[in-house]
Amino acid sequence: MLAAAATFAAFVAVTSSAPDRDPDIVRKSFVIIKATPSYAEARTLALAAAERLAIRLDLRELVPDASVGLTFSQDACASEFGEFPCYVPRGRWDDGVYLSVEHSSSYEGFEEGLYVVMLASGSPRDRTIGAAVRRAKGQYPDVSVKTAPLYLGCIH
């Protein structure tokens, strides 16, 4: 009986009580200067913030699209995904500090239908996230950080 109890205790000790987690989904933090329904406003703000904060701007050659919010070019979509329009949210393999305009509908927990001026993306514990907030706070007092799950698996 004692041996069975010890075996059960050992089994419980090595068995995770947490549900299985999808290894292709990770949590990412995003430093946000502003979210707006206007792409033109978001783009103008991103350009100004890049100059004001002396931080690189990377719009990733995205353009507005009525059906998905933002899209890559028809050629890029066709060669990468086989269909148009297409959008891949920031944070998959491009973390760091740089300004971009992203579409909120691709981020779980973000208000839908907005263009988001992002200053940085990375792991929630990445020091660059806090550093980006501190750098922007003087010029953009409403800067915020949102954390969301992001799928890193195959999207073909």
Regions found by a protein language model. Name each.
Residues 11-156:
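Acidic/polar low-complexity segments and flexible, solvent-exposed patches
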Residues 2-10:
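Hydrophobic helical h-region of N-terminal Sec-dependent signal peptides
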